[in-house]
Swiss-Prot record:
It comes from Coturnix japonica (Japanese quail). Calcitriol binds at residues 258, 295, 299, 326, 418. This is Vitamin D3 receptor. The lineage of its organism: Eukaryota, Metazoa, Chordata, Craniata, Vertebrata. PROSITE patterns: NR_LBD (PS51843), NUCLEAR_REC_DBD_1 (PS00031), NUCLEAR_REC_DBD_2 (PS51030). One of its GO terms (molecular function) is zinc ion binding.
Amino acid sequence: MVSISASGGYAMPCCCESQELQSSDMETPAVGTPEFDRNVPRICGVCGDRATGFHFNAMTCEGCKGFFRRSMKRKAMFTCPFSGDCKITKDNRRHCQACRLKRCVDIGMMKEFILTDEEVQRKREMILKRKEEEALKESLKPKLSEEQQKVINILLEAHHKTFDTTYSDFNKFRPPVRSKFSSSTATHSSSVVSQDFSSEDSNDVFGSDAFGAFPEPMEPQMFSNLDLSEESDESPSMNIELPHLPMLPHLADLVSYSIQKVIGFAKMIPGFRDLTAEDQIALLKSSAIEVIMLRSNQSFTMEDMSWTCGSNDFKYKVSDVTQAGHSMDLLEPLVKFQVGLKKLNLHEEEHVLLMAICILSPDRPGVQDTSLVESIQDRLSDTLQTYIRCRHPPPGSRLLYAKMIQKLADLRSLNEEHSKQYRCLSFQPEHSMQLTPLVLEVFGNEIS
């Protein structure tokens, strides 16, 4: 006969497996045990059942964990009725407690790892306290309200409706013409869809009741003055001598098209339609070029510092924009702005909120109801700040809101430089005649 003692006394027979599963002692890593592969099934070292982890310094199942804990705490002494070398399995582990306890000791289970009742109670209290702290922390964490989430969803939809990532409409512009000195060349499209660009049609393009006439969703024929009609043979721009600024006609069409899309986006901003038509126009005239610069970041590529809008014909480098009349006084800070904005890695939600905040700026010239504009912008700003705290993980979220607001300040400087260069361009008739009525209306008649 072989006796296995746990410091004297007999333990009551194990009446049911469920009692063993109620063990609450601390699970401990095995002393000196090498790392194991978590993908490999873990087997209890005592009975061969599925193990749940290291318990009291050995890999065991919940049943053997509970059996060892009770045996040690009760100082049980078991006697094997056989030869003392019973094979312990999942099915017979309750038949011989002596050999089962011996097996527990043999695989390295140690009573020193067993918690006292007081330690168990303290552990339970610590766990409960930690859960309560986590619940409190979660409850204090800012959350987007239903209204804020609705605003974000509306802005996302507005952006998707007014920003074509295929850039298919670019084929409707007067074709890009790059001089032989440019680093890139472009071929003309076989069929060119052009616009009637006579400056005589510029009257009342942006009239006070123009907003009510804009169809939704946005379509090419948004403005009566900008009818995109197909020409049978060649564009009117092909009948004149190649201008000194060969890219101006194409980029003028691109900017005109972009203004239309900005107007469409603005109309869907919650609260924008609550403003008077005069204030809507004032906001759009002042912010249009800034929002275009913001939106263009989606096509900006840092690898070669270009704007890629589909095919190579519509891949724009700084040299292309200089051939439309702009100087490095604008382009150098513009590229720097694009790089900085790209590095912020904004979520699309943050991007559309920034565009809306840019448009709804109460300090724009000509705005009458500044308090209403400010209240709309404040709601958008609050939504952006809450979104960053809730959805933008660190470290990218650190000071992100402040960095985004700084980008709006940078846009003001770019806007000012663009206006200066536009005025120089528009004072030259041979260049101003290449501009569209909408471009002339938005950038030409400055609000004082």
